[in-house]
């Protein structure tokens, strides 16, 4: 499973908040961050299936003869924009459902109130959407590599025939 980390541009904020005794609030924020991404990922399957259905013979041959991540790269090229468009409203809803904005605003407001702190305010919807999509492609790339390199991972008859 992929874990979405605290936003990079807010890492200093995280460190500072933990130092001032807010570890449990930071942990809760990270849990809700990942819950929002998980909600969005359920829509990936239909988008990936559609991309595979639109695949040409040339695409299939390139994937078959390609590197360990050729299929992943194909899916990334064919689906990234559509995944973003589908995921972002779901992420927005999920953020509301799990009160992520409440957690983020509380953390950001307390951090921003500290003297000498560099103010933070990243776009959580965009961050979570992109991290969820990137996480999916990491999982797909790992699975693809395993299928290509390990005959036991080729669990379907079709995969066994393709990689003979």
Range-by-range predicted roles:
Residues 1-5, 63, 158-161:
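Soluble periplasmic/extracytoplasmic beta-strand elements of cell-envelope proteins
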Residues 132-164:
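A cross-kingdom marker for long, charged
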Residues 82, 86, 90-131:
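An amphipathic alpha-helical core segment
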């Amino acid at each position: 499973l992929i874990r979405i980390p605290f936003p990079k541009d807010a890492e200093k904020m995280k460190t500072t908040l933990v130092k001032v005794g807010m570890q449990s609030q930071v942990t809760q924020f990270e849990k809700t961050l990942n819950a929002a991404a998980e909600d969005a990922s359920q829509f990936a399957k239909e988008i990936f299936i559609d991309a595979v259905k639109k695949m040409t013979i040339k695409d299939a041959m390139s994937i078959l003869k390609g590197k360990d991540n050729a299929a992943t790269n194909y899916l990334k090229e064919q689906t990234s924009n559509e995944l973003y468009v589908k995921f972002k409203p779901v992420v927005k809803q999920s953020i509301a459902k799990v009160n992520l904005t409440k957690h983020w605003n509380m953390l950001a407001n307390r951090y921003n109130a500290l003297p000498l702190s560099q103010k933070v305010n990243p776009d959580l919807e965009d961050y979570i959407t992109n991290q969820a999509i990137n996480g999916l492609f990491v999982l797909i790339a790992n699975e693809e590599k395993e299928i290509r390199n390990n005959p036991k991972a080729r669990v379907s008859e079709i995969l066994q025939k393709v990689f003979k």
